[in-house]
């Protein structure tokens, strides 16, 4: 091992100086440390594989030998920092590199995931062509994040340094990166003990810290941009995504707010807020969907790692970031679709709500006491009875609403039917009734003539409309009259035959019929009142209309002759004809009501007769019961007397007499 290391020591030293800088302090064993680094040839990978087998034992042994931060006395007393320890430490670093840095074979399996880290530009034809690969020297951001998180963990301690208590970003700024001097930090707890210069310098630590902060800032800015936009970055959306990445390792690292739930400590905790897994990209361009980008469409991907530690770390980060990404995606979708979606209306589950609570909010029918008791005896609960009452109230209200709607419909239809009829009546009246000849009279007659014409037309219209209303409201009155005419004749015949008979029941029936006829007339008058109101007003208006003739009937002035022409006669005939029709309609209604009253009265009389028969039968039964009670009482007294006689005599003769008396008594009872 050492011979191979001596041949390749110069190449490794140059690479080491290029990466980490050159130590300013001199040490006699520095050359030996450069020659005995144990790295071997950079071109041969077999040594890395060989060292990987001994990595676990080296790590455990080094951790056993590695002093803690607070163990100062042991560190000062033991000689851990001699030239013999250097190869083991470097071998430990090589084992770490071999375990945590994936091989080329492992990288080829992730080509479809790594290619999507590049940027593409959309040309005019709509096909996206890949531009130059990102200038980031560290292609695999996820690999770098896992690597640096292992270095930045609190439990990881380099053997050549004491980790400061406040090793934050402010202590390692960009100004220290340009400095070529190597300042050895003094620790008061180690009694101003200086660090051996053959180990890795502070510049290496500054480089790693700045690299860690730069990666962290890049990922955090990416997360912030995705969180603000509510969606993933699209290829070719804006010019900000097309410029190559230029790392600024020498600048000051950006500051981040320390979250108590995410950061394990102030000193560069694990990558808890870094988006290791890449989110999905929308590959739609301005002119269509790119086929190549669809083939390389990146899904949520976890890189394949050869080390168990790296797999655990990447899995934890990926799961946490997937959860964050899903939550942000749901929030963004809800924000974008809030204006398009209808509000979510939640209907309560009525099956969970008790019946008593539901019934208190609903109208209920008052349940009588008898019905309530019968329902309870049938096995119903109070809640069930209340529910039945609520259902009955609902149906009752529904019927009322339906009846009101039907009445409104009927009123509307009647109005629509009566409107053209009244219009035709007015037209007929305007044709039939000529202008009055009072226009040739003086001013007094002229002043009264317009009112007369208006009143006459209105009177005729109202009178005819009342007749039509009667016909509309009672369209089946003629049919009813014709159907019940033979029944009326039968009633008349029965009345005549009953009149010839001289029984009391017949006289009583005649009296009932007379009272029923009077009641029928009253009912007919009550029913005809709404229709006769118009006729009464018509009569008044007709009287006003005839007032211009000087009260024809009362005063009989000669003006009667003047106006008794053929037209007035026709008008009077029409009036009389309408009045006769009205009287006929009233008679028909009265007859119908009379028939109904007669039938009801007959049924009432039958009920009364049945009641009388029942009363008489009950009276007879009570008399029979009383007679039986008397007989029983007499028999009991006779038995007592017989017993007394038997006890007093005590002889056979007395017994015989008693028996003879019994026989006589029984014979009497049987005869009765």
UniProtKB/Swiss-Prot annotation:
Q: Where is this region: Disordered?
A: 1-44, 157-265, 299-347, 475-574
Family, per the entry? Belongs to the bZIP family.
Q: Does the keyword Coiled coil apply?
A: yes
Keywords noted in UniProt: Activator, Amino-acid biosynthesis, Coiled coil, Cysteine biosynthesis, DNA-binding, Methionine biosynthesis, Nucleus, Phosphoprotein, Transcription, Transcription regulation
Q: Could you identify this protein by its name?
A: Transcriptional activator of sulfur metabolism MET4
Q: Where is this motif: 9aaTAD 3?
A: 109-117
Instruction: Using the record's annotation, list all stretches that form the bZIP domain.
Output: 586-649
Stretches assigned to coiled coil: 609-648
* Cellular localisation: Nucleus
- Basic and acidic residues: which segments have biased composition? 1-10, 175-188, 487-498, 519-528, 537-565
Question: Segment Transcriptional activation: which positions?
Answer: 95-144
Question: Where are the annotated segments for Inhibitory region?
Answer: 188-235
**Primary localisation category:** nucleus
Give the region (Leucine-zipper) as residue ranges: 614-642
Region described as Auxiliary: spans on this chain: 312-375
Q: What else is known?
A: Present with 1300 molecules/cell in log phase SD medium. Transcriptional activation function is inhibited by the elevation of intracellular S-adenosylmethionine (AdoMet), but is activated by cadmium and arsenic which leads to phosphorylation and prevents ubiquitination. Inactivation by oxidative stress induced by hydrogen peroxide promotes ubiquitination.
For whether the record's keyword set contains Methyltransferase, the answer is no
The text the record gives for the protein's domains is: The 9aaTAD motif is a transactivation domain present in a large number of yeast and animal transcription factors.
UniProt-listed GO biological process terms: cysteine biosynthetic process; methionine biosynthetic process; positive regulation of transcription by RNA polymerase II; regulation of sulfur metabolic process; regulation of transcription by RNA polymerase II; response to arsenic-containing substance; response to cadmium ion; sulfur amino acid metabolic process
Residues modified as Phosphoserine: 416, 564
* UniProt GO cellular component terms: Cbf1-Met4-Met28 complex; nucleus; transcription regulator complex
**Subunit architecture:** Interacts with MET30. Tethered to DNA through two alternate complexes associating MET4 with MET28 and either MET31 or MET32. Interacts with MET28 and CBF1 through its leucine zipper to form a heteromeric complex.
Question: What organism is the protein native to?
Answer: Saccharomyces cerevisiae (strain ATCC 204508 / S288c) (Baker's yeast)
Q: Where is the composition biased (Polar residues)?
A: 202-214, 251-265, 301-321, 477-486
Output the superkingdom of the source species: Eukaryota
The UniProt function text for this chain reads:
Positive trans-acting factor capable of stimulating the transcription of the MET genes from the methionine biosynthetic pathway. MET4, MET28 and CBF1 are required for full induction of MET25 and MET16 gene transcription. MET4 controls as well the derepression of MET6. Required for the transcription of genes necessary for sulfur amino acid biosynthesis. Involved in the transcription activation of MET28 and MET30. Required for MET3 gene expression via assembly of the MET4-MET28-MET31 and MET4-MET28-MET32 complexes. Involved in response to cadmium and arsenic.
Short sequence motif named 9aaTAD 1, residue ranges: 89-97
């Amino acid at each position: 091992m050492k011979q191979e290391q001596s041949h390749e020591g110069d190449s490794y030293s140059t690479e080491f100086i290029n990466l980490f800088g050159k130590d300013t302090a001199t040490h006699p064993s520095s050359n030996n440390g450069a020659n005995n680094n144990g790295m071997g040839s950079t071109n041969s990978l077999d040594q890395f594989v060989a060292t990987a087998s001994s990595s676990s034992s080296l790590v455990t042994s080094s951790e056993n030998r590695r002093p803690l931060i607070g163990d100062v006395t042991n560190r000062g007393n033991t000689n851990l920092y001699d030239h013999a320890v250097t190869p083991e430490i470097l071998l430990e670093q090589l084992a770490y590199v071999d375990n945590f840095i994936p091989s080329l074979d492992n990288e080829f399996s992730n080509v479809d995931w790594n290619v999507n880290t590049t940027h593409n530009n959309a040309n005019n034809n709509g096909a996206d062509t890949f531009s130059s690969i990102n200038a980031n020297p560290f292609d695999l951001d996820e690999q770098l994040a896992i690597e640096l998180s292992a270095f930045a963990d609190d439990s990881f301690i380099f053997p050549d340094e004491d980790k400061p208590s406040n090793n934050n970003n402010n202590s390692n700024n960009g100004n220290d990166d340009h400095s070529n001097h190597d300042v050895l930090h003094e620790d008061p707890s180690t009694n101003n003990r200086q660090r051996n210069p053959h180990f890795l310098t502070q510049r290496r630590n500054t480089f790693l810290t700045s690299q860690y902060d730069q990666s962290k800032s890049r990922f955090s800015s990416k997360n912030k941009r995705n969180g603000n936009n509510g969606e993933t970055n699209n290829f070719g959306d804006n010019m900000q995504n097309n410029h190559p990445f230029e790392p600024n390792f020498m600048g000051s690292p950006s500051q981040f707010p320390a979250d108590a739930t995410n950061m394990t400590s102030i000193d560069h905790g694990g990558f808890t807020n870094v988006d290791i897994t890449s989110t999905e990209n929308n590959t739609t361009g301005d002119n269509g969907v790119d086929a190549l980008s669809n083939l390389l469409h990146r899904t949520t991907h976890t890189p394949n790692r050869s080390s168990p530690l790296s797999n655990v770390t990447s899995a934890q980060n990926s799961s946490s970031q997937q959860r964050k990404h899903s939550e942000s995606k749901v929030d963004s979708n809800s924000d974008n679709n809030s204006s398009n979606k209808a509000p979510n209306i939640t209907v309560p589950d009525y099956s969970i709500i008790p019946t008593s609570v539901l019934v208190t909010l609903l109208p209920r029918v008052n349940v009588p006491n008898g019905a309530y008791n019968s329902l309870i005896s049938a096995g119903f609960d109070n809640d069930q009875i209340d529910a039945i009452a609520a259902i009955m109230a609902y149906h009752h209200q529904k019927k009322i609403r339906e009846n009101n709607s039907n009445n409104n419909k009927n009123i509307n239809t009647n109005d629509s039917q009566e409107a053209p009829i009244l219009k035709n009546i007015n037209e007929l009246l305007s044709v039939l009734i000529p202008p009055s000849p009072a226009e040739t009279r003086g001013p007094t007659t002229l002043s009264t003539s317009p009112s007369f014409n208006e009143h006459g037309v209105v009177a005729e219209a109202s009178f005819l409309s009342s007749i039509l209303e009667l016909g509309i409201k009672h369209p089946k009155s003629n049919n009813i009259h014709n159907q019940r005419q033979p029944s009326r004749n039968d009633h008349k015949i029965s009345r005549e035959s009953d009149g010839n008979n001289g029984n009391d029941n017949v006289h009583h029936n005649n009296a009932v019929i007379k009272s029923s006829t009077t009641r029928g007339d009253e009912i007919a008058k009550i029913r005809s009142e709404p229709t006769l109101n118009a006729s009464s007003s018509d009569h008044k208006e007709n009287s006003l209309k005839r007032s211009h003739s000087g009260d024809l009937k009362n005063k009989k002035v000669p003006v009667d002759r003047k106006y008794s022409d053929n037209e007035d006669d026709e008008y009077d005939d029409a009036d009389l004809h309408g009045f006769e029709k009205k009287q006929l309609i009233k008679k028909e209604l009265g007859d119908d009501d009379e028939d109904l009253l007669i039938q009801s009265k007959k049924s009432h009389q039958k009920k009364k007769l049945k009641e009388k028969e029942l009363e008489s039968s009950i009276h007879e039964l009570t008399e029979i019961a009383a007679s039986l009670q008397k007989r029983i009482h007499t028999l009991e007294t006779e038995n007592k007397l017989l017993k007394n006689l038997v006890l007093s005599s005590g002889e056979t003769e007395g017994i015989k007499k008693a028996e003879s008396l019994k026989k006589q008594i029984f014979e009497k009872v049987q005869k009765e």
